[in-house]
Amino acid sequence: MRKVIGIGETILDIIFRGDQPSAAVPGGSVFNGIVSLGRMGINVGFISETGNDRVGNIILQFMRENNIPTDHVNVFPDGKSPVSLAFLNEQSDAEYIFYKDYPKQRLDVLFPKLEEDDIVMVGSYYALNPVLREKVLELLDQAREKKAIIYYDPNFRSSHKNEAMKLAPTIIENLEYADIVRGSLEDFLYMYNMQDIDKIYKDKIKFYCPQFICTAGGQKVALRTNLVNKDYPVEPLQAVSTIGAGDNFNGGLIYGSVSYTHLRAHETV
């Protein structure tokens, strides 16, 4: 059975409405997509790390409840599990503050065994962080060797926009590994100060990875490949919260792909 393996951060999101906390739920960009897939009965795995504390226990229990094995989560004895504060505005968009205290030794964990046509999800700053780069590359190399499909979501946030130039070589390396790239217009604004989808694809993506999907919140979804140039309208809706919207888009897209037993990246588009 095909597997979907993610690597990324697990964090406890404390959600505020009107300056009052309303909920506390485990989150993380790749993690959110894996949770959606686990709930849908897909065979998933997640590579991550958390502290040996109450927050870490909440995260691990949440994973078990959502059909995600915890075998590949490094529970570190030093440091603390990360926490974020998510402040929702009137449009239910979130502004984040992060609190992190990681140990020096990171991601000391065995990776799951990959097979051909498995899907590997990578993204966010976790896939760019120099401290974790060696481990991320180890997974990407294994995926390439086993002919797994690599799905890359840059999920590049405003907190890192001043590092965009410094991180550019690592972003390019991730694009070179990727079989499918899915990003939002917001990501590319912070990465490249660009908002034109066709220009982003032509100048920044296509040379490295021909399969590109770009979302724009409540606006259209754009698909660009060597053979396809299509835009898909998005039905209007009243969002309860936009937290994890792009992450769950990833989950839905991958769920559709996994429904086809022998679907390679170039066949999906």
Task: Spell out what each predicted region is.
Residues 146, 160-231:
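Conserved phosphate/ATP/ADP-binding segment of small-molecule kinases
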